[in-house]
Curated annotation (Swiss-Prot):
Gene (UniProt): rimM
Species name: Thermosipho melanesiensis (strain DSM 12029 / CIP 104789 / BI429)
Keyword rRNA processing: yes
Phylogenetic classification of the source organism: Bacteria, Thermotogati, Thermotogota, Thermotogae, Thermotogales
Location in the cell: Cytoplasm
Its biological purpose: An accessory protein needed during the final step in the assembly of 30S ribosomal subunit, possibly for assembly of the head region. Essential for efficient processing of 16S rRNA. May be needed both before and after RbfA during the maturation of 16S rRNA. It has affinity for free ribosomal 30S subunits but not for 70S ribosomes.
Protein name: Ribosome maturation factor RimM
Domain notes for this protein: The PRC barrel domain binds ribosomal protein uS19.
Principal cellular location given in the protein's record: cytoplasm
Amino acid sequence: MIKTLHELLKDKVPIAVLGKTHGLNGELRLFPLTNMPEVIESLEEVFIYNEKVKKLLIGRIIHMSLANGYYIVKFRGIDTLNDAKKFVGSTLYIEKSRLPILSSDEYYFYEVIGMKVYDEKGIFLGNIDEVIQTGSNDVFVINKDTKDEILIPVIKEYVLQIDKKSNKIVVKLPEWLD
């Protein structure tokens, strides 16, 4: 049976993006899409999706080391600079089942992307399009149709409720948005 890319990625979640090459022996920079280093550091086998060539491959990591805000990674079978260049910009995926179980007040980015956002009065503000990591706290990017985006800091003062079951988030709008 032939499966579509959507079907192949159904139970998988993006975990990192491959950046520029590093050195001459096929190493690449790996930029995590999670703030959980233990998930990245435990990776052994990943699904590599390259948008340019529309290919999904399985990659086995044989070496990884931490650098300045990213990792240097070496895959089996990628041994030259030219080999590595083919994977620049690729996204790494893992099975959702391999992610650590979170407490009820924690979430993975993929769980909140697309959620509906309402203010305290029940007015629909839009959907979560993106989660930005700022270092001090995450920020939800909310879009409704083509109007301006709303940025909400992910702190208790502004994010009042995240209900994964009903796909709904309730926020208090910051004063500067009034």
